Amino acid sequence: MLEEALAAIQNARDLEELKALKARYLGKKGLLTQEMKGLSALPLEERRKRGQELNAIKAALEAALEAREKALEEAALKEALERERVDVSLPGASLFSGGLHPITLMERELVEIFRALGYQAVEGPEVESEFFNFDALNIPEHHPARDMWDTFWLAGEGFRLEGPLGEEVEGRLLLRTHTSPMQVRYMVAHTPPFRIVVPGRVFRFEQTDATHEAVFHQLEGLVVGEGITMAHLKGAIYELAQALFGPDSKVRFQPVYFPFVEPGAQFAVWWPEGGKWLELGGAGMVHPKVFQAVDAYRERLGLPSAYRGVTGFAFGLGVERLAMLRYGIPDIRYFFGGRLKFLEQFKGVL
């Protein structure tokens, strides 16, 4: 039995097979255990002799089992290490990494410029009411200024639009044509003084070409308080120009009409590298009728008027135009064309 058992133990291929051999010989119903149980039937002298033989066999089997178990464990460990070994000389697996969209990069840069000047960045809804997009901004129905904006009007029932304080807003709905509605929303919910910028996406129903898109981005600015003048507006635009184009940049203001500001101006920045004036956006002093519309809306909500005796300025500029200048992009349609080769150029740009 001993020779047979030792040979079987030595040839065991894995720990499961070794466990089965241990049970076969040393288990409760094992061969050696049964032999030892039969010792009681033997005469005393023969029992003593046979008991010594069986104990020696048991010790030999236990030693062989322990040695084989250790050998199998070492072999399994070696195999696992070999299987999991990493060849550090092999080239690493390349991982796909994304990057920020150039519009996001430009928008973040603009917001950070104004945050350094004490402005707070806020956002408004893209689905807007006719009141906030037009009426409250001194662009009533049938006003000729509405022809300046080609609008996406929304049809259908069941959409609830919330106002600045969570109230339900009635009237026709549209995709906002500019970020200016957030001026009114913010003024309804807050009292001056304050400085805010409003980055966001806007929509115009117009034909697309290299410089025009139906969907684009604007950055709106609004400052309201006592004694705010055109000089403060010019100072803010000068700071923007120097942050974007360097300390040698110059700013030019030209009079222009916008219904929600009076006086209104269009501002351009001298671009030293390009050697030309770049029209960036429009600005002006907030029209008194806008303040009146805000106070009237506040009173309907049971709030006291807050915009009598204050002044403010507002400005707006196109994010795409600045991004095209910053990154040398010739066609605005590249931004939303979905071409990976174009977008991958901006990996790592912060």
Swiss-Prot record:
GO terms for molecular function: ATP binding; magnesium ion binding; phenylalanine-tRNA ligase activity; tRNA binding. Keywords: Aminoacyl-tRNA synthetase, ATP-binding, Cytoplasm, Ligase, Magnesium, Metal-binding, Nucleotide-binding, Protein biosynthesis. Tetramer of two alpha and two beta subunits. It catalyses: tRNA(Phe) + L-phenylalanine + ATP = L-phenylalanyl-tRNA(Phe) + AMP + diphosphate + H(+). It is found in: Cytoplasm. PROSITE patterns: AA_TRNA_LIGASE_II. One of its GO terms (cellular component) is cytoplasm. This is Phenylalanine--tRNA ligase alpha subunit. Its main location: cytoplasm. Mg(2+) binds at residue 262. Transmembrane segments: none annotated. Its EC number is 6.1.1.20. It comes from the Bacteria. Belongs to the class-II aminoacyl-tRNA synthetase family. Phe-tRNA synthetase alpha subunit type 1 subfamily. SUPFAM superfamilies: Class II aaRS and biotin synthetases (SSF55681), tRNA-binding arm (SSF46589). Binds 2 magnesium ions per tetramer. One of its GO terms (biological process) is phenylalanyl-tRNA aminoacylation. Its cofactor is Mg(2+).
